Amino acid sequence: MIIVDQENKTILNNYIEIFINDSADCMNGILARTLDGTICTLGEYARLSRTQMVFNEIVEAYAKGISVFNMPKE
């Protein structure tokens, strides 16, 4: 489960930041920047995390305007 501070839209640890790359198609245009600075597409992140639910929750939250997430540690 992704927990987001609704007021500040941030959380204390293990962040990823989601942002849009307008030059790419929809799925590959949603990028994830992890706390260590790694950037990958959201699809790649979901595969790396091996959790489709995480991917779905990110997409839902992003649609609500939330772009910084506290990701569960494996």
Regions inferred by a protein language model and the residue ranges of each:
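Eukaryotic intrinsically disordered, low-complexity regulatory linkers and tails enriched in Ser/Thr/Pro
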Residues: M1-E74
